[in-house]
Structure formats: structure tokens, C-alpha cells
Amino acid sequence: MSWFHRERAGINRTQIKKSRVPQGMWVKCPGCSATLLAKDLDANLNVCPTCGHHHRIGARRRLESLLDAATWQELDSGMTSVDFLQFKDSKSYQERIDSALSKGGSRDAVVCVEGSIEGTAVQVAVFDFSFMGGSMGSVVGEKITRAIERGVQKRQPVIIVSASGGARMQESILSLMQMAKTSAALAKLKDAGLPFISILTDPTTGGVTASFAMLGDINIAEPKALIGFAGPRVIEQTLRQKLPDGFQRAEYLLEHGMLDVIVPRTEMRAKLASILGILYRPAA
């Protein structure tokens, strides 16, 4: 008898096809490490149902969550940044613009619309952090200024939702000028007796914090949002001191009088409607 003769049939090794999980179907929460269905997270406005961690959210999805359905219209959507300084670091500014545009989202770091909240007409500007870190250049400053000026002209409240790394370094002094430009426009809104509501989300830093983001008649933040000028690591290295726990987080700023209220994203629309009902009376 041959040593290699098989007297019994071998194990059936029929290959079972492995099922492929679609990319992006699951999301791991950085707050509690829970694995969440992406569609469930989106349905809850990117707020973790387990721990309440506020994931970042796109500008248009945020607008859908805040404004009355089918009432808002985007304005100044064709404006795009130009590399007028021929700025180049590891790659040119124009390459960075083209890369951001290729993602197919916003044409710059802010989306400005006219819409309504519970029937109250408002001018709203929402930052898109996915576009060059929500940095403020000349286009962002101009779009925000125009939104504020429309508010003055039409006697409507202005709401700005910030999510930004600050002024756009590729535009040098012209980006810093937007801080004064937007703040001056808000002074006109104040003189007209119209409310400005500032919503600070994670992160709101740099020149955006140092200008319009902290000038609201009501300053609202999302839970645990990072809000500050320089980053905590830069401050620690400069001062050579350990910063307090929770420094630059929304809760710390509220405790020290820098904010009026912290509102979860899922409750933001109702809170805005309530505030507008108190601060604003439409012209008859």
C-alpha cells in the first residue's frame, strides 16, 4: 500500500467568499472608542449617541440642521481665492486651492446663505473646516462682510458658525486685514440695532477668534469645542508652564465668562429660535 494513497475523502475546502465591508460604513468615536454606523451618526448630526462627542460636520449638513427646509439660498458662491502673492511653502498656494476644490465641497472656507429659522429671516455664514482648515483669507472675509451688510440692508439678524484655524498665512497681511474688515461690518450691524449670534465650534482659533467670533451679542459654543488664539502646545512652550485642565475648551471659557451658553448641536436650532424671539422683532 502506498504511503501517499488516501483511503478517505479529504475535508471539503470550498472557498467561502469574504464579504467586503463598504469603506466608510463604520466610524470609531474618539471620545469613547465606540464603533458607530456612519448613517446613524449622520442622522444624529455627527454627535456620538454613546458619549455625546461632537464630531466635525460639513457646512451644508449644518445648514440643513439649523434652517427651515427649502428656505435657504446660497449667495456669493462663485467667489474663489486667487494666489496674487505667488506664495509657496512646500507647494504653491494655487496648488493648495486646487487640491481643496478637487474635493468637490465648498469653493472656499465659508458658505453664506439667506434663509429662515422658525419663520424668522436670517443671514447665516457657516465655515467649512475641510477647506484649508477653515482658514480666513480675502474671499472668506469678503463673503462674511457681504452677509453682514445684507443683514443691515434687509434688517435681518446675522448668525456666524465658526470652525477655523485662523487667518490664511498664504495671503499674508491681506488675510489679517479681514479681521478688521469683518469687525467693522459688525459695528454697523450693532449701530442698526440688529442681533449678531456667534456660534463657536471645534476648533475656533487664531484670527477668527481674535475678531468676529467673540463679538456676538450672544456667544454660543458646542460642548468641548477648542476655542483660543494660539494653540495650547504653543502657549506651554512659550510660557514653560503647564496649562490648567480643560484650558481653551468651551466649558473652561464659560466658567471664566467668555461665553454665554454651551448648546449641544442637536438642540442648537431650537435655542437659536428662542434667542431670536427675544432679541429680534421683524419690521412690520
Swiss-Prot record:
Its EC number is 2.1.3.15. Gene3D superfamilies: 2-enoyl-CoA Hydratase, Chain A, domain 1. It catalyses: N(6)-carboxybiotinyl-L-lysyl-[protein] + acetyl-CoA = N(6)-biotinyl-L-lysyl-[protein] + malonyl-CoA. It is found in: Cytoplasm. GO terms for biological process: fatty acid biosynthetic process; malonyl-CoA biosynthetic process. One of its GO terms (molecular function) is ATP binding. SUPFAM superfamilies: ClpP/crotonase (SSF52096). Zn(2+) binds at C29, C32, C48, C51. A zinc finger (C4-type) spans 29-51. Pathway: Lipid metabolism; malonyl-CoA biosynthesis; malonyl-CoA from acetyl-CoA: step 1/1. It comes from the Bacteria. Keywords: ATP-binding, Cytoplasm, Fatty acid biosynthesis, Fatty acid metabolism, Lipid biosynthesis, Lipid metabolism, Metal-binding, Nucleotide-binding, Transferase, Zinc, Zinc-finger. Binds 1 zinc ion per subunit. Its cofactor is Zn(2+). One of its GO terms (cellular component) is acetate CoA-transferase complex. Its main location: cytoplasm. InterPro entries: AcCoA_carboxyl_beta, Acetyl_CoA_COase_Trfase_b_su, ClpP/crotonase-like_dom_sf, COA_CT_N, Znf-ACC. Residues 25-284 form the CoA carboxyltransferase N-terminal domain. Pfam families: Carboxyl_trans (PF01039), Zn_ribbon_ACC (PF17848). Acetyl-CoA carboxylase is a heterohexamer composed of biotin carboxyl carrier protein (AccB), biotin carboxylase (AccC) and two subunits each of ACCase subunit alpha (AccA) and ACCase subunit beta (AccD). Component of the acetyl coenzyme A carboxylase (ACC) complex. Biotin carboxylase (BC) catalyzes the carboxylation of biotin on its carrier protein (BCCP) and then the CO(2) group is transferred by the transcarboxylase to acetyl-CoA to form malonyl-CoA. Belongs to the AccD/PCCB family. This is Acetyl-coenzyme A carboxylase carboxyl transferase subunit beta. It comes from Pelobacter propionicus (strain DSM 2379 / NBRC 103807 / OttBd1). The gene is accD.
